[in-house]
UniProtKB/Swiss-Prot annotation:
Protein encoded by which gene: panB
Name of this chain's protein: 3-methyl-2-oxobutanoate hydroxymethyltransferase
GO cellular component terms given for this protein: cytoplasm
Main EC class the enzyme belongs to: transferase
InterPro entries xrefs: Pantoate_hydroxy_MeTrfase, Pyrv/PenolPyrv_kinase-like_dom, Pyrv_kinase-like_dom_sf
Cofactor note: Binds 1 Mg(2+) ion per subunit.
Amino acid sequence: MSVQSAIRRRTAPDIRARKNGDPIVMLTSYHAHTAALVDRYCDVILVGDSLGNVMHGFETTVPVTLDMMILQGRAVMRGSQQALVVVDMPFGSYEASKEQAFHSAARLLKETLCGAVKLEGGVKMAETIAFLSARGIPVMGHVGLTPQSINTLGSFRAQGREEGTWQPIEDDARAVAEAGAFSMVIEAVAEPLARRITETVAIPTIGIGASPACDGQVLVLEDMLGLSPRAPKFVRRYGELGPMIEAAIEGYARDVRSRAFPGPEHVYAMKPKS
């Protein structure tokens, strides 16, 4: 048996069992190399549709396609061994009907070999979540700020910060949990509301701009590494790789133009005659 096959990958039931337990650590990844690094420390790797922003420069996640998610999901699965890999269902791949959602989710599982899918929406998507869950597809929910709805929302502002706005978000969270999701992301929601949802739903909550009381946390990898020029309020920078990478590229360009690179140690000499 190979070393890789001997390593047990985390599953959706493993994450479901972490409710009120040790905090769940989750980060995004879109490449095999970063997936290998993230895999060492994280319980869950999210192949997020945020790849549209990070990799392709889109202003929103709306243009992301199912084929794009499959391509990067495959890369992350090849680069990781231990973490549960969850792949986002992109806008337009699941909203039309339960059947459309099943066919899209089945493609994601079959073609990437990931362990679960994530979709946005609460009450309106509960029937779809139940349909998928009953057919062997683990679903991670996503409530609060739902970026795929940007054209309806108008902006990426935090939710539940005004009195009288909590009930719809609570209803969404409850509907997702009762429909059979194994966990849910709570994004950009007022801290007291995120805390209350975490205390009342039976499945783990994973916060992003939510509350330290959530059962876990997630960030976009490039945001926390300092690779994004701008980051939301809820991001803590754990590195400043952007300036480091720029300095390295500047040094490379300088050495090429001055012919300092390549040096003698970087080129191949002729083999001696026998």
